[in-house]
Regions:
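Surface-exposed, glycine/proline- and aromatic-rich loop segments on solvent-exposed faces
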Residues: 111-142
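Acidic, serine/threonine-rich low-complexity disordered tracts
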Residues: 38-123, 149-271
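Intrinsic-disorder/low-complexity peptide segments enriched for small residues
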Residues: 2, 22-23, 61, 97
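Bacterial N-terminal signal peptides
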Residues: 16-27
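Bacterial N-terminal signal peptides that target proteins for export
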Residues: 2-18
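Sec/Tat signal peptide C-region and signal peptidase I cleavage site
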Residues: 29-33
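Acidic/proline-rich low-complexity IDRs
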Residues: 3, 7, 23-24, 172
Length: 271
């Protein structure tokens, strides 16, 4: 399945409204294509704050996609993340690993793997931790499967919500017994969606990103939650959480390299 682009240039952002109808209508039989023209004509709805985003890169986009999250991480370091999914059809757990190949990931060649083995993640030349793109790619693929909609449609909603300059809130979290300062971004990309009636169960879906320079890779936690009845997030219908677990220096060096240091003891994020 072809990966999508997660970062807009200024020209792409400015042209979205004009292009949205043709992009969505190109997929015959798409569940949301019938309303694509109306969404584009309304600038993705005046009620949606994401539609009024500046052509400039928003701080939230810069934090998630344009920051060098892997700076300072040595080659052959493995970053481990726990993934937990709750809700129908079943509760699932997984481990996602990011292996740093080049120092600071300068070559953009970090490798991502999960229970199924190596995962191709669209790098797009972005300096960010690829686990962010891994999580978002999985999320929109799941939305497509659950709703019968189009991946590109859901991806655009998430991008617009981040482009709307959502608040970046300072938070303090407990990571393996230590207080860690972090930055939190929360978005709900499907609120006021003109096509929301077609996937009403997911209108209130919430995305939370927690970033911290206190951990290697800077991704402390990413979570999505589909609220229960009456917008109840205390008892979500579905949730998926990716949380940082630690960093490990591999004992198998790259060809021509010396054996790296022993395991790096780093704080683990509490879920």
């Amino acid at each position: 399945m072809k990966a999508l682009t997660w970062m807009w240039t200024a020209s792409r952002r400015a042209a979205w409204v004009a292009a949205a109808a043709s992009v969505l209508l190109a997929a015959s039989g798409d569940a949301f294509a019938a309303d694509a023209s109306a969404a584009a004509a309304n600038g993705a709805s005046a009620a949606n704050p994401a539609s009024s985003a500046s052509p400039d890169i928003a701080p939230a986009e810069r934090l998630l996609f344009m920051s060098t999250h892997l700076k300072g991480v040595q080659p052959q370091t493995e970053l481990d993340y726990a993934v937990e999914r709750t809700g129908p059809p079943a509760r699932e757990k997984d481990t996602v690993k990011v292996l740093i190949v080049s120092s600071d990931n300068a070559n953009g060649d970090a490798l991502v793997s999960d229970h199924g083995g190596k995962v191709e993640v669209p790098g797009e030349g972005l300096p960010c931790n690829p686990v962010i793109l891994y999580f978002l790619e999985h999320d929109i693929a799941e939305m497509e499967q659950l709703t019968g909609g189009q991946r590109r449609y859901f991806q655009r909603r998430v991008r617009l919500a981040l482009a709307a300059s959502p608040a970046i809130t300072p938070v303090v979290l407990n990571a393996q017994g230590k207080k860690v300062t972090a930055k939190q971004i929360v978005i709900q990309p499907y609120l006021d969606d003109p096509n929301g009636a077609r996937f009403s169960q997911y209108i209130g879906k919430r995305y939370t990103f927690v970033m911290s320079e206190a951990v290697p890779g800077q991704v402390l936690l990413i979570r999505t939650e589909v609220p229960g009845s009456n917008n109840d997030f205390a008892h979500p219908l579905q949730s998926e959480t990716l949380s940082y677990q630690g960093a490990l220096r591999s004992l198998s060096p790259l060809p021509g390299k010396q054996t790296p240091d022993k395991a790096v003891n780093a704080p683990r994020a509490s879920r």
